[in-house]
Amino acid sequence: MEIPRKITIGVPQSLAVFGMSENNRREELKHSAMTFGTDGLGLAVGGPLAKGLPHPRSYGAFARILGRYVREQGILSLEEAVYKMTGLAAQKLRLKDRGLIRPGLAADLVIFDPVSITDKATYENPHQYAEGIL
């Protein structure tokens, strides 16, 4: 296919399609079966993992939920959001040893400030860590 090849020469291999309605997203976030996850990559703001223009969610998916939809818009309570990110997600994935803080269970803890947590990554400048994670 000659035409697509000519168009993409020298252009970064990245595409952002905005097809979701923000109103629909708000309703989906509130649904009792909705869990939160991301397909973002493990990246860094410096070194070999700071190349290209990845989707901003690689740096700020969970911070966006906590900052925008919990603190700013009040779509969910903080407790609901954390449960959807942890306990409910583990339950849906049938990870019996994850999702709760309890003796004998595996746990990775993230300490954050609910007053300041904010995603900073953008499509133009995606390599930015979220603020408010201690």
Feature annotation, model-predicted:
Residues M1-I9, R26-V115:
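His/Asp/Glu-enriched, well-ordered alpha-helical/loop segment
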Residues A16-F18, V45:
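Helix-coil boundary/capping segments in enzymes
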Residues G19-N23:
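Buried, small/hydrophobic-residue-enriched core segments of structured protein domains
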Residues S116, A121-L134:
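Phosphate/diphosphate-binding loops
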